[in-house]
């Protein structure tokens, strides 16, 4: 996000990606039943979780563009619940290619495809999450966000186990208002805000790239926010609009043809 003077930080575990404090952990949530979210991916650098992601094709993961970093021996882990345990259902992949959206710049268009070097083996613990989103989510809609991010706003370490929290969609008009983000950043039509009126439920550091699911539909990706768990600074998400879905389909088309 173009977070100018209000200083926002992307939700990347262990790495501050922009100004001063844009977040990425699950605040106020709970641990999910192990392996009940089989579409979740952990993007890791040198074996350390940095961002979440979503498996949308056996060889493709969708995540946030700001999760990209040169070097660092990047891998993607599928089928995980605990990041530290040697779970037999885990599948680990080298990354063949990072493809950020061509319009990504300082947070706008914060979406990226990752092509795995080999295709995942789909089974009970590793499954796809299909794109069925529309351009609009009604204000007040309850949604779930999932990730391995921090669980306390003042502790910047990731959660070992997968967490989930229910957040509420906040209208773009309100999120851009003076009492919220005041257009720093501007919440565009390709973005959406979600949080909690009391600031008790939020995404935060380490959750970037994970899914926002509303009534069973994959609508958005975690992007960032100002710190964590602040009522008038909710999480900011990349909305999976028609523009992005068309781009995704164009990139996946050659893979589907094989």
Swiss-Prot record:
The gene is Gzmk. CDD domains: Tryp_SPc. The lineage of its organism: Eukaryota, Metazoa, Chordata, Craniata, Vertebrata. GO terms for biological process: granzyme-mediated programmed cell death signaling pathway; protein maturation; proteolysis. This is Granzyme K. Disulfide bonds join 51-67, 143-214, 175-193, 204-228. It is found in: Cytoplasmic granule. InterPro entries: Peptidase_S1_PA, Peptidase_S1_PA_chymotrypsin, Peptidase_S1A, Trypsin_dom, TRYPSIN_HIS, TRYPSIN_SER. Its main location: cytoplasm. It comes from Rattus norvegicus (Rat). Residues 26-253 form the Peptidase S1 domain.
């Amino acid at each position: 996000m173009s977070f100018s003077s209000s200083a926002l930080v992307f939700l990347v575990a262990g790495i501050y990606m922009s100004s001063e404090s844009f977040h990425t952990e699950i605040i106020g949530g709970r641990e999910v039943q192990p392996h009940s979210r089989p579409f979740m991916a952990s993007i890791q650098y040198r074996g350390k979780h940095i961002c979440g992601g979503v498996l949308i094709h056996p060889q493709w993961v969708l995540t946030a563009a700001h999760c990209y970093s040169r070097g660092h021996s990047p891998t993607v882990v599928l089928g995980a619940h605990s990041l530290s345990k040697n779970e037999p259902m885990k599948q680990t992949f080298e990354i063949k290619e990072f493809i950020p959206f061509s319009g990504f710049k300082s947070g706008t268009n914060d979406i990226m495809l990752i092509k795995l070097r080999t295709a995942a083996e789909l089974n009970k613990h590793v499954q796809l999450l299909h794109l069925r989103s529309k351009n609009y989510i009604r204000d007040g809609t309850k949604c779930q966000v999932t990730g391995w991010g921090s669980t306390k706003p003042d502790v910047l370490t990731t959660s070992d186990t997968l967490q989930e929290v229910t957040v509420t969609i906040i209208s773009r008009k309100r999120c851009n208002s003076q009492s919220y983000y005041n257009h720093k950043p501007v919440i565009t039509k390709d973005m959406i805000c979600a949080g909690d009126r009391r600031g008790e439920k939020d995404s935060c550091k380490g959750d970037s790239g994970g899914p926002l699911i509303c009534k069973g539909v994959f609508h958005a990706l975690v992007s960032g926010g100002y710190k964590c768990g602040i009522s008038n600074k909710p999480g900011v998400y990349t909305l999976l609009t028609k523009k992005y879905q068309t781009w995704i389909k164009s990139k996946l088309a050659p893979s589907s043809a094989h």
